[in-house]
């Protein structure tokens, strides 16, 4: 008889789909399970529902703390995939939020930004961890950050949304032109872009915005599309399947807090600009970024930079730290990888 596994996923967004793919890939290549997939709110909040069937294990994403606690008290093997701090001693698999913040800061630094901001929610642990990583990486590079943080309500209302857009717009107006802002997630990034529009600030020319999680639908819905740090949701699911198999086999100790490294940054329109004091160098760099893999030459770059070859060489070494030819190669390698 196959083990009976309950998979509870309240949301069916892109992240959840990737996690499920990872779980199912492990299951199909290892010990088979009998799986029940549920997303009903009652299943995730009503702990008595767990007693209705003889489950052998639970993998849950965004279930209530009551549900997680009840599963633990029933001595069910359980893996919690919610992106919050560890509770009840159960095995938790989640993104490495500190690393996500680090990656966001490094991305902006590489693109030559000099002013930085973070937007998030003070009562969400993942937001706080991402801010901590972002600020830490900036400080290691000798740079500083200003933050805009509010408490996120249990239920978002139109009144709350409108108020936040207004407050955000005021904060954005107070920032230096060309500030690079990391938002704690893609939904927050969308709010920042709406607030920038309210403030009369164009994205990415006046304000660059980077999200996190890389929810493709959310990132592609608006204009401009949102650049985002991509978490490795598939690997989260694969590791969940691996650890669940060990639990079902009766192995002893299991990791309590597994953190999965992000995959990288997916660049879209909201950050697709290089912050350079020299506008001609910025134009040349943007041209290289866009056409590096199409066999462009330094002569073609010169046509966009409106300067002599010697001036271009001098300014690239000053602002970029590489010659134009090496920058073309660097951009080619970055796109391939």
Map each language-model feature to its residues.
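Bacterial carbohydrate/catabolite-sensing allosteric modules
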Residues: 1-57, 66-306, 313, 334
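Terminal helix-turn-helix DNA-binding modules in bacterial transcription factors
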Residues: 299, 318-337
């Amino acid at each position: 008889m196959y083990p009976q596994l309950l998979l509870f996923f309240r949301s069916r967004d892109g992240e959840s789909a990737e996690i499920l793919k990872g779980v199912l890939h492990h299951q199909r290549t290892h010990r088979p399970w009998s799986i029940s997939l549920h997303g009903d709110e009652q299943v995730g909040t009503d702990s008595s529902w767990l007693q209705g069937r003889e489950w052998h294990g639970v993998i849950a994403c965004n279930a209530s703390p009551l549900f997680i606690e009840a599963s633990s008290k029933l001595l069910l093997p359980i893996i919690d995939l919610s992106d919050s701090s560890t509770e009840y001693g159960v095995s938790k698999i989640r993104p490495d939020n500190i690393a996500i913040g680090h990656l966001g800061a490094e991305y902006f630094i590489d693109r030559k930004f000099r002013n930085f901001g973070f937007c998030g929610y003070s009562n969400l642990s993942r937001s706080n961890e991402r801010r901590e990583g972002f600020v830490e990486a900036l400080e290691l590079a000798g740079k500083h950050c200003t933050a805009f943080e509010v408490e996120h309500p249990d239920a978002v209302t139109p009144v709350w949304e409108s108020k936040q857009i207004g407050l955000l717009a005021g904060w954005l107006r107070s920032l230096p032109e060309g500030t690079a802002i990391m938002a704690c997630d893609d939904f927050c990034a969308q709010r920042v872009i709406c607030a920038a529009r309210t403030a009369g600030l164009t994205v990415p020319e006046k304000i660059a915005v980077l999200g996190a999680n890389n929810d493709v639908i959310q990132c592609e819905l608006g204009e401009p599309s949102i650049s985002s740090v991509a978490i490795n949701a598939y690997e989260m699911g694969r590791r969940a399947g691996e650890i669940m198999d060990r639990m079902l086999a009766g192995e002893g100790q299991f990791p309590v807090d597994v953190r999965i490294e992000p995959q990288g940054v997916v660049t879209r329109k909201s950050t697709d600009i290089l912050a350079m004091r020299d506008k001609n160098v910025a134009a040349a760099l943007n041209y290289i970024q866009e056409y590096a893999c199409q066999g462009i030459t330094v002569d073609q770059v010169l046509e966009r930079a409106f300067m002599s070859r010697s001036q271009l060489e001098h300014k690239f070494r000053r602002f970029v730290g590489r010659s134009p030819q090496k920058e073309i190669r660097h951009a080619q390698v970055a796109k391939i990888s």
